[in-house]
Curated annotation (Swiss-Prot):
Pfam families named in the record: ATP-synt_C
GO molecular function: lipid binding; proton-transporting ATP synthase activity, rotational mechanism
Disulfide bonds: none
Gene name as annotated: atpH
Protein name in UniProt: ATP synthase subunit c, chloroplastic
Main location: plastid
Amino acid sequence: MNPLIAAASVIAAGLAVGLASIGPGVGQGTAAGQAVEGIARQPEAEDKIRGTLLLSLAFMEALTIYGLVVALALLFANPFV
């Protein structure tokens, strides 16, 4: 394998995971903060807020997992060879 292609694949894999983690990380922090604020204002709605929060966190985490899948494909099933 060409060393330049191997180096580019490793760099691209790192960027894929890193950039795919930034957005969901910020979103999860914001969502958790807003959920805590909502529970503090309306303690009786805690179950509904918690359920919605956990579902939305799972959807946000899926974006990071997609970035990981792309990185693994670049590293082990190298499409550039």
